[in-house]
Structures are given as structure tokens and as C-alpha cells.
């Protein structure tokens, strides 16, 4: 298997039609749903001004290469400065911002989005896996991640013979598959917490938003449907002679959507952080349930065909590197065209949504 770090990046085609940068609107919608937790966490940090650092160091883990990466970090800086103004604190802090993602991330495209005049803010690219150490011990005040830590460090072992014709957990998967994914998640999330616990100063904070599962039963149909439909598309292409059966049998996506109980248990067991807040929310696959005055988004314009393409393009932006590496790049347009049609059929009979979890943590 090729090095997983090279395959777990988003579609890095700069600002092309299928790039993550141009297909991350759904992530922006999801991020906006969790911003109130981020704001409350920042208010808690500023609440006790005594000892607040003159240089506030923060990190965005899994920043990718689109405009969303800068949206949250700039929002954090603006919020902190506004809170200082409200408290009549004249001397604003300086900021060091570390933008982290895997080495193949398009950092060049990301830094092109930066303003040439950053004032009191200093921004650095930080390539590397967040399942490894990224910064010196006790050097970070705040860490943030949005829709990244549900990605596993590797495909769980032992799936090839147990999960045929599926590319992720599915309702037809045997119990061994669910156990393998859960075990890999527990190991990875515990490692993640331990490493961030080493890097973040005592009393520092961390806010994480990620895909979750609405029920404890891992075979829940709605929570698995997005990848089940992609698997069915590949099965159809095997029948048409467009994909090799062995290639399908040997492919599984390294992702896991935990339930809230698993998240709470992992945080408690690892012990570096206190769980201050946990919230959940849903967003429709095509984001048609979301309206925002700034975006002037009208849910009525989401027809079935557009919804299918929107969902397929979003999934393509986050999965194409690993799919193209395994099945070949020449079938990607055909694959996601067929996938979009299956999405249309699915949404015509079911109103599916993504289930998200957001947590706010304090370093003990």
C-alpha cells in the first residue's frame, strides 16, 4: 500500500473545478454551525486576563488549501481583539498562527490568499500528520480542527477478506469490520489527544468539530449512506467491466464517525484534557436546509440534479486522491457522474444529513 500520508490530502488541483478549494462550501456551512462554541471558548480564555500571553500561539490542524482555512483563524483574531476592546485593554497581543496539514497539501495556494499586510499576525505553514508531534512541548495556547480528525491514520487491518463490495462500514458488514474501525479510531484519537496534551500549555484550549454518528449502533443506515452509495457505484462499474473486482475488494476508506459516547470515553481515558462542552448538529447533504444572509442562499434553488452534483463534487474533493491512486485517474469523471445519479435517486426518497460533533476541551 502506498504511504497513507500521500493519499489523505484533499484534492489539491489548485483552484480547479474539482479542487477542494472550489468544493468546500459544505464545510463552510458546517463550520458556521459550530462557531458559537468557538466564540464561547475564546470568551473563557479572555475572561481571566491575568497571565494572558503577549504572543498568542494557535494552530489549525487539517487546514487544507481553501479559503475556509483562513476564515476561522482570522475570525479568532478578530474575536480576541474585540474582546480586548470591550474590556478596555489597550495593548493587543501578537499572534502566531500555524496552519497544519499533510505535506502534499497545496500550501502555496493557501499562502496566496494571505494579505500582504498581516500587522500583528505571523502565519506559518506546518506540514505533517497530526498523529505525530507538530510543535515543542507547552508551546501552544489554542488548537482548532474542523472536519479532519475523523480521518484515521491508516486503513484498519484485516478488512480485505471481511468487507468485500464495501469501501467503508456498511449495514452488510460483519461485526469484525465495525470492531476494526472502532479499534483504529480509539487508538488514533487517544494518540491525537496525548500529543496535543504535550504541545498545549496547562489551561490552554482546543475546539474540534468532526463527523459523528447519531446512534451507538455503527450499522445505522443514514450515517453510512454517503459511502454505501459510492460503493454501489463501484460495484456497478465492476459489472460493466470498468473496474477490476480485486481492486474493489482491496479498497477501504480510512475514516470513522464516532458516537458521542466513544468521544467522551476516549477523552476521559486518555486524561490530558477536560471536556468542557459537547454539542451535536445536522446539516443536509446538499446544505439546502441552511440559509445565511451573507451568502444569500435560497433553499428553493436546490433541484434534484443540482443537489446530486453538489454532493458528488463535495465527496470527490475529499476522496479523489485515494480513489485515483487505487482505481486509476481515468475513471474519475465517469465514477462521480454515476455517483451523482445515485445521490439524486437517494435524495428523491430520503432526506439524508451529516451528523456533526463539536467539543471544547481544556488542557489539565
From Swiss-Prot:
Pfam families registered for this protein in UniProt: Methyltransf_7
Keyword Electron transport applies: no
Alphabetized GO MF terms: metal ion binding; S-adenosyl-L-methionine:benzoic acid carboxyl methyl transferase activity
Annotated positions for site Involved in substrate discrimination: 144
PTM (free text): The N-terminus is blocked.
Superkingdom of this protein's organism: Eukaryota
Residues bound to Mg(2+): 163, 251-252
Tissue expression remark: Expressed only in the upper and lower petal lobes. Not found in the corolla tubes, anthers, pistils, sepals and ovaries.
E.C. no: 2.1.1.273
Sections of the chain in a coiled coil: none
Residues engaged in binding S-adenosyl-L-homocysteine: 20, 63, 68, 101-102, 129-130
Induction annotation: Fades out in flower petals after pollination, thus resulting in a decrease in methylbenzoate emission. Strongly repressed by ethylene.
Catalytic activity, as annotated: benzoate + S-adenosyl-L-methionine = methyl benzoate + S-adenosyl-L-homocysteine
Chain residues that bind benzoate: 27, 150-151
Family of this protein: Belongs to the methyltransferase superfamily. Type-7 methyltransferase family.
Role this protein plays: Converts benzoic acid into the volatile ester methyl benzoates. This scent, mostly produced in a rhythmical, diurnal manner, attracts the pollinators.
Protein name as annotated: Benzoate carboxyl methyltransferase
Record organism: Antirrhinum majus
Amino acid at each position: 500500500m502506498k504511504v497513507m500520508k500521500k493519499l489523505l490530502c484533499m484534492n489539491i488541483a489548485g483552484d480547479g473545478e474539482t479542487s477542494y478549494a472550489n468544493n468546500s462550501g459544505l464545510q463552510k456551512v458546517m463550520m458556521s454551525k459550530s462557531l458559537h462554541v468557538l466564540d464561547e471558548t475564546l470568551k473563557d480564555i479572555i475572561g481571566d486576563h491575568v497571565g494572558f500571553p503577549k504572543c498568542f500561539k494557535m494552530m489549525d490542524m487539517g487546514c487544507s488549501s481553501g479559503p475556509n482555512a483562513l476564515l476561522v483563524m482570522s475570525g479568532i483574531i478578530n474575536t480576541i481583539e474585540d474582546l480586548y476592546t470591550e474590556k478596555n485593554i489597550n495593548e493587543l497581543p501578537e499572534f502566531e498562527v500555524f496552519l497544519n496539514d499533510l505535506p502534499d497539501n497545496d500550501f502555496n495556494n493557501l499562502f496566496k490568499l494571505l494579505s500582504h499586510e498581516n500587522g500583528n499576525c505571523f502565519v506559518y505553514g506546518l506540514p505533517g500528520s497530526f498523529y505525530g508531534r507538530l510543535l515543542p512541548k507547552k508551546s501552544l495556547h489554542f488548537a482548532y480542527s474542523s472536519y479532519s480528525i475523523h480521518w484515521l491514520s491508516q486503513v484498519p487491518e484485516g478488512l480485505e477478506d471481511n468487507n468485500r463490495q464495501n469501501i467503508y462500514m456498511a449495514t452488510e458488514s460483519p461485526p469484525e469490520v465495525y470492531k476494526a474501525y472502532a479499534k483504529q479510531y480509539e487508538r488514533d484519537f487517544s494518540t491525537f489527544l496525548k500529543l496535543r496534551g504535550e504541545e498545549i500549555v496547562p489551561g490552554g484550549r482546543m475546539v474540534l468539530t468532526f463527523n459523528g454518528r447519531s446512534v451507538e449502533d455503527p450499522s445505522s443506515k443514514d450515517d453510512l449512506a454517503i459511502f454505501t452509495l459510492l460503493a454501489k457505484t463501484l460495484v456497478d462499474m465492476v459489472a460493466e467491466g470498468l473496474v477490476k473486482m480485486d481492486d474493489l475488494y482491496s479498497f477501504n476508506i480510512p475514516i470513522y464517525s464516532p458516537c458521542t459516547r466513544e468521544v467522551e470515553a476516549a477523552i476521559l481515558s486518555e486524561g490530558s484534557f477536560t471536556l468542557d462542552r459537547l454539542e451535536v448538529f445536522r446539516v443536509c447533504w446538499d446544505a439546502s436546509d441552511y440559509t445565511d444572509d451573507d451568502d444569500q442562499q435560497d433553499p428553493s434553488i436546490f433541484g434534484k440534479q443540482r443537489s446530486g452534483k453538489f454532493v458528488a463534487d463535495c465527496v470527490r474533493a475529499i476522496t479523489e486522491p485515494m480513489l485515483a491512486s487505487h482505481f486509476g485517474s481515468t475513471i474519475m469523471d465517469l465514477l462521480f457522474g454515476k455517483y451523482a445519479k445515485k445521490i439524486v435517486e437517494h435524495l428523491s426518497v430520503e432526506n439524508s444529513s451529516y451528523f456533526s460533533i463539536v467539543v471544547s476541551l481544556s488542557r489539565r
